[in-house]
Amino acid sequence: MTHINKGKPFPLGSSLTSQGVNFSLVATNAEYVEILLFEKEGSISPKSILKLDQNHNTGPYWHAEVKNLNEGCFYAFRVKQKNNGINNNYEKKVLLDPCSRGITGWGSYKRENALETHENTNSCLKSVVCDRELFNFRDYPRPKHSWEETIIYCIIFLFYSKSIYTTFI
């Protein structure tokens, strides 16, 4: 049986603790969040599903510390949204941790399954718990470019590719 504590909302993603791994995810409109733990990279179904109730919710953050987990474990999330009048049927979707430092499952990943509403545990990407302290930031310094001289482009592809000459079928 897996033991979980309340955990902390920060840092986001997964982080090693003295007792296991802390998970934190932003899910503003969630009714609950599930952490799916996979035995190995190629697992098509989770070995454990940990449902986080409101005790693991602080504002928009959902968090839990799972005891006895180590670096290298494979995980993902599922989010059940509150009933907001929109029938999206995505609570079965396996979601990659947006703050993950390691991603696996590219060999079995199928984008078309990610876009459908049915369950996609057999073809999803999985996050990998990595030790944050091992990355040497000194070897990869920030670019020596001032923010005043930085140009950030934002493009909305729907409107960028939409034209009067485009034919939609």
Predicted feature residues:
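Beta-strand signatures of extracellular beta-sandwich domains
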Residues: 34-36, 76
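The feature marks proteins involved in alpha-glucan
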Residues: 1-18, 57-61, 68-152, 163-168
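Conserved, mostly hydrophobic/aromatic
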Residues: 25, 77, 155
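Structural beta-strand segments of beta-rich domains
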Residues: 19-23
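Solvent-exposed serine/threonine-rich low-complexity stretches and specific carbohydrate-binding patches
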Residues: 46-56
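Short proline/glycine-enriched turn/loop motifs at strand-loop junctions of beta-rich domains
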Residues: 26-32, 69
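Short S/T/G- and acidic-enriched coil/turn segments that sit immediately N-terminal to beta-strands
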Residues: 48, 60-63
